[in-house]
């Protein structure tokens, strides 16, 4: 603390005038003698501190001691107000001034300078002209509050001109239409990278928000803005005053910055002048083994850090007791949580179970005993008998590691039966119990070991393996040589075939197809191809889909070798409806594979006209092991176009010798079957090609039409009203489909971008009108949810 001399006279006047000053003042007036007289026993502060003390004393005298307590609380860290403390040397002067102001003897302090300096300043100010005095007064003004920031200035970021225009235009629309427009825009353009600045974590979001505020102030100006602008337009002097104040504030900030830099420089120079390495060892203290000292108990780094924080908080706020109570409460909470945790037992069941990964924590919870509820008392200071002083102790040396378990300590795993090191047993148990199929893996590994290495098999396995060997090698252990190898392949374990399933991801599609094709043999592929082509007769024992004739008797096809001896009354292999003008069939010769078409019906059996003779064909070369079945040269008019000859393996269609077929006789004219009746209009799906032109439809139909919209029932979309209701709208035919979507949005809340409309099998587009799709009165439109990224179903 600054110390001042205890004196009866202030220091400024010289020694010759000291005894004369009080006598002159007493002669002038007795009333002013009391405040001007120096008091013996009071330390007078320096002029700059005296001004603060006098002002504070005047305020405290007027407002009471509550004001003093408020100043002491607000300025607790300000050293200029240390005179408020009772232990400060200037506190007596402060109390003296407070009593003088209460009695009305003291005057309000004008400045913290001596009287001689005040008289000189008054004389000089009287001599100066008025303009200079005004300048001096203006220079002493210090701005208190910063000027208001510019509301319509925002530095644009370094982006392209197009992106800047997008941000500005979006901000203008948001300022005009409100926050609801911003929410809808974010939902609609959430996948558009051009509008990423709408997200709060984007770098342009602050600039966008500033633009919205500026546009909002322009479109919806505050109440006093017009009055302020009108006043500034009529009185330019006010604008100049604002500019001058802003300039003075900039100068003040610059002076403050320079002052801080000068203080830092002074502090740096003061630190540089200290020779930190210039020290002298005064004394070395050696502690003897039998010496007993009153030292505090040892602390941990955590406790030391907590003590430092408590001390700093006490110096700052004076809340040491509350902090200690908070620390104790935290420790008690942790102890209660640990005590409430029940000790869990490790499940030793060998069945397949889904184990949690927290098994290690549970085991540790078993081994570690719960902490005691009562806090442990602090350790007592060590006694001389217990203290061991080590002279070679190095606190920086690394602590010795705990002894590792011996490498030859192995434990048998209860899961796999393998020998596991003791250090890795816990990790092995955790990993083994994570897999619920460890039993299958264990059995499979045991079987593989038994089949690979028979040397280490137990006694019963040796007996069974010898029996298997005797059954396979009867030339050694028996008398029949024909039984050699009869058991080969029979002892193979019949493993259940794992079905290949697809998980639904596009990345695993090719891998799943390869896995499914790996289990299919070549024979199964050939059979599947011939079943699809119709070359193989279907099994009548299997259940067929679709209606069948009640009087139809399924018959097996005759062998190919007796095809020439079939009587004329034998029915064909497959019969189809035919017109009445068709002549009766004579013989069945060739089976043709005709693909199934929707209409007209096609025949699967080729019949020859009467009078034709079947001659034997030359033998077919068997090198490629395939038979080519040729088609007849002509066919009845009811048959479909002739397909190419089918290539059939010999295992399914043997090729008997057949004579070449001569040209048949001219067939009588056959009338085609009557066409099938058209399907009803409700079952037909329209296409855009079948629609009537828009102009012609408008000429035929005039006036508005009533349209029904079938809304789906989607309970998971709670934000939309999709309860399966039917919406009815009356619209003119010239309106576009987008008008319907807007009305659906108003009724259900479903955005137009999420709507998918279908009318009679056609997905209608927004840009086309109702007349384009030939919508009549009472047309029904089905509403569905548009799935982004997927194909239209």
Curated annotation (Swiss-Prot):
InterPro entries attached to this UniProt entry: SF3A1, SF3A1_dom, SF3As1_ubi, Surp, SWAP/Surp_sf, Ubiquitin-like_dom, Ubiquitin-like_domsf
Record region (Required and sufficient for nuclear import): 680-702
One cellular component (GO) term of this entry: U2-type spliceosomal complex
Phosphotyrosine PTM sites in chain numbering: 456, 759
Region annotation (Disordered) ranges: 1-42, 318-412, 488-518, 530-584, 666-685
MF terms in GO: RNA binding
UniProt-annotated location(s): Nucleus; Nucleus speckle
Domain (Ubiquitin-like): residue spans on this chain: 707-793
Keyword Ubl conjugation in record: yes
GO biological process terms, semicolon-separated: mRNA cis splicing, via spliceosome; mRNA splicing, via spliceosome; U2-type prespliceosome assembly
Site note Critical for binding to SF3A3, residues: 169
Basic and acidic residues: compositionally biased ranges: 21-34, 388-397, 488-502
Compositional bias ranges of the Polar residues kind: 509-518, 563-572
One Pfam family this sequence matches: Surp
Pro residues bias (residue ranges): 368-384, 666-675
Domain text: SURP motif 2 mediates direct binding to SF3A3.
PANTHER family: SPLICEOSOME ASSOCIATED PROTEIN 114/SWAP SPLICING FACTOR-RELATED (PTHR15316), SPLICING FACTOR 3A SUBUNIT 1 (PTHR15316:SF1)
Subunit structure: Component of the 17S U2 SnRNP complex, a ribonucleoprotein complex that contains small nuclear RNA (snRNA) U2 and a number of specific proteins. Part of the SF3A subcomplex of the 17S U2 SnRNP complex which is composed of three subunits; SF3A3/SAP61, SF3A2/SAP62 and SF3A1/SAP114. SF3A associates with the splicing factor SF3B and a 12S RNA unit to form the mature 17S U2 small nuclear ribonucleoprotein complex (17S U2 snRNP). SF3A1 functions as a scaffold that interacts directly with both SF3A2 and SF3A3. Identified in the spliceosome 'E' complex, a precursor of the spliceosome 'A' complex.
Protein name per its UniProtKB record: Splicing factor 3A subunit 1
Encoding gene per record: SF3A1
């Amino acid at each position: 603390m600054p110390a001042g001399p205890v004196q009866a006279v202030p220091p400024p006047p010289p020694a010759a005038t000291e005894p004369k000053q009080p006598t002159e003042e007493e002669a002038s007036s007795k009333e002013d003698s009391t405040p001007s007289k120096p008091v013996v026993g009071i330390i007078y502060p320096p002029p700059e501190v005296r001004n603060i003390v006098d002002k504070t004393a005047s305020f405290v005298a007027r407002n009471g001691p509550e004001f003093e307590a408020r100043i002491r609380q607000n300025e607790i860290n300000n050293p200029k107000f240390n005179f408020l403390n009772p232990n400060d040397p200037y506190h007596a002067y402060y109390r003296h001034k407070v009593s003088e102001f209460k009695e009305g003897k003291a005057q309000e302090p004008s400045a913290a300078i001596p009287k001689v300096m005040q008289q000189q300043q008054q004389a000089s100010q009287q001599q100066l002209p008025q303009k200079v005095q005004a300048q001096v007064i203006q220079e002493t003004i210090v701005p208190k509050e910063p000027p208001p920031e510019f509301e319509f200035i925002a530095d644009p970021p370094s982006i392209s001109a197009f992106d800047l225009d997008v941000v500005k235009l979006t901000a203008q629309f948001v300022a005009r239409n409100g926050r609801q427009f911003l929410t809808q825009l974010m939902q609609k353009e959430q996948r558009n990278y051009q509008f990423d600045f709408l997200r709060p974590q984007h770098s342009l979001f602050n600039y966008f928000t500033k633009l919205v505020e500026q546009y909002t102030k322009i479109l919806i100006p505050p109440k006093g803005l017009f009055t302020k602008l009108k006043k500034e337009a009529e009185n330019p002097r006010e604008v100049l005053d604002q500019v001058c104040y802003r300039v003075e504030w900039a100068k003040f900030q610059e002076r403050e910055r320079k002052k801080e830099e000068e203080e830092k420089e002074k502090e740096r120079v003061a630190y540089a002048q200290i020779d930190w390495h210039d020290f002298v060892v005064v004394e070395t203290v050696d502690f003897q083994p039998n010496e007993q000292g009153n030292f505090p108990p040892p602390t941990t780094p955590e406790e030391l850090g907590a003590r430092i924080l408590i001390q700093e908080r006490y110096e700052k706020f004076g809340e040491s007791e509350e902090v200690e109570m908070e620390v104790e409460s935290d420790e008690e909470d942790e102890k209660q949580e640990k005590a409430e945790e029940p000790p869990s037992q490790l499940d030793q069941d060998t069945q397949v179970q889904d184990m949690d990964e927290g098994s290690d924590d549970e085991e540790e919870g078993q081994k570690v005993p719960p902490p005691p509820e009562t806090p442990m008392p602090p350790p007592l200071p060590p006694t001389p008998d217990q203290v061991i002083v080590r002279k070679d102790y190095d606190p920086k040396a690394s602590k010795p590691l705990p002894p590792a378990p011996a490498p030859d300590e192995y434990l048998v795993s209860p899961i796999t039966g393998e020998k596991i090191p003791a250090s890795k047993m816990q990790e092995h148990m955790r990993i083994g119990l994570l897999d619920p199929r460890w039993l299958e893996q264990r059995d499979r590994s045991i079987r593989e070991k038994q089949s690979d290495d028979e040397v280490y098999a137990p006694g019963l396995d040796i007996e069974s393996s010898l029996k298997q060997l005797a059954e396979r090698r009867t030339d050694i252990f028996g008398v029949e040589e024909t039984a050699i190898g009869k058991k080969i392949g029979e002892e193979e374990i019949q493993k259940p075939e794992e079905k290949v399933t697809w998980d639904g991801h596009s990345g695993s599609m090719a891998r799943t197809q390869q896995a499914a094709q790996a289990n299919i043999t070549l024979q199964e592929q050939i059979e599947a191809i011939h079943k699809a082509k119709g070359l193989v007769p279907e099994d009548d024992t299997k259940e067929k889909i679709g209606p069948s004739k009640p009087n139809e008797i399924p018959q097996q096809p005759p062998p190919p070798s007796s095809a020439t001896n079939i009587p004329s009354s034998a029915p064909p292999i497959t019969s189809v409806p035919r017109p009445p003008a068709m002549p009766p069939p004579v013989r069945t010769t060739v089976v043709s594979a005709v693909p199934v078409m929707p209409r007209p019906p096609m025949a699967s059996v080729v019949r020859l006209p009467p009078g034709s003779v079947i001659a034997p064909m030359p033998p077919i070369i068997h090198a490629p092991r395939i038979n080519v079945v040729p088609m007849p040269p002509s066919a009845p008019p009811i048959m479909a176009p002739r397909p190419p000859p089918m290539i059939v393996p010999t295992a399914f269609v043997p090729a008997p010798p057949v004579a070449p077929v001569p040209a048949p006789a001219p067939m009588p004219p056959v009338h085609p079957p009557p066409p099938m009746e058209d399907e009803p209009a409700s079952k037909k799906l329209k296409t855009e090609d079948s629609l009537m032109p828009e102009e012609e439809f408008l000429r035929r139909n005039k006036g508005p039409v009533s349209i029904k919209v079938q809304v789906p029932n989607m309970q998971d979309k709670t934000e939309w009203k999709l309860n399966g209701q039917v919406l009815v709208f009356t619209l003119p035919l010239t309106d576009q489909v987008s008008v319907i979507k807007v009305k659906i949005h108003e009724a259900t809340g479903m955005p137009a971008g999420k709507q998918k409309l279908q009318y009679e099998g056609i997905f209608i587009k927004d840009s086309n009108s109702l007349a384009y799709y030939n919508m009549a009165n009472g047309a029904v439109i089905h509403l569905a949810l548009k799935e982004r990224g997927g194909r239209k179903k």
